[in-house]
Amino acid sequence: MDTVQKLFRFLDESPTCYHAAANAKAALTAAGAVELRESEQWKLEKGTLYVVERGDSALVAFRVPEGPFHGFLMAAAHSDSPTFKVRETAEAASAGNTLRLSVEPYGGGVWRGWLDRPLSVAGRVMIRQGDRLVSRLVNIDRDLLVIPGVAIHMDRSVNKGAELNPAVDLLPLLGCGKEPGAFRKLIAEAAGVREEHLLSTELFLYPRTKAVQTGLNGEFIVSPRLDDLQCVFGCLEGFLAAKPGGSLPVLAVFNNEEVGSNTRQGADSTFLTDVLERIAHGCGLDSEAWKAAVANSFMVSADNAHAIHPAHPEYADKGEYPVLGGGIVIKYNANQRYTTDAVSGAVFQAICQEAGVPVQRYSNRADLPGGSTLGNISTAHLSVPTVDIGLPQLAMHSVCETAGAADTDYLVKAMTAYFSRDFHRDRDGGIVF
């Protein structure tokens, strides 16, 4: 199976952040990773691959080297995408004989694209098993819902950018009739439990659209959730393919980037530093050696970037702008929305050059602020040189996004080279990698 088809399978099988984390963990355990639990003491073995999960939606994987290591080579991406979260009181009666699902927006999505297309629901539920509470993933794997738009005959402004009210216009149709509790019954059946054992839910809408390849020569890929599952996939593949050198490789997949990252499983948490400190302790590093290891560390923050739009090139900076299929994008911002500086940009560019991977550069147009990402958030907790990168795409945060088919291979190749390096500083302050 080639890289694009493997990516498509990962995208199609990861309708929510919970499924994305579960599929990433499954790939790691298939490669021999030993699962650790934060609530237990760790005993680390040399040469062993490990994975630890938090909140069913974030994970950190690492491989303990056979010998001493200088520091940590880290990469981070995120498992979530803009969508709609189903409320705990899920059913909402509406005009006529229809029953709608009560939802609210999650993140900053382009919501109009969600209208008039088949949708469904997936996520995690908490259930009672005897005297235990356990989480279980669910996916209603069929065309279940639709958010109907208003006919042009009733709203002549529909093609003029009419504003959508999420409390009025964006509630999906669930069914006909007023049968109370029908949705809860459906979820309990999907979880394989009796209704009284279904205690709580975290469910999200997802489009039923599958990932596809388009273009005269298959140059493009079109799929939901490319931001940021394309980077999750590329970093994961590179992490698994690498042959570690003198640094300890670490892969972090965070959740909740689309809503600010300030959750216990987000980049603005202690998750990564908690894991690194426990690695240091398990490898016998004292406080002084731990600080030296951090000083000899590096991070790649991987979150997709904006390509120049064929219909609106004016939104791009007039200098250098990324194109689909043109390679990995290094992102820069004077106000530190991206963490790339001269040092981190040079390190990653040099690695890509040696790996034969093309590099592009991106800066927001000076009068368009753009968004922030994982790098500047995580470095507030762990002060290491960090480069913000991504793969170029169009229609970011739309229900379906477009990217270049060749770029995923570039990311896998670059991350394989990156995780195989030995990054540290010499006695003169120079960087050895």
List where the protein language model places each region:
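N-terminal hydrophobic/helix-forming segments and targeting peptides
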Residues: 1-433
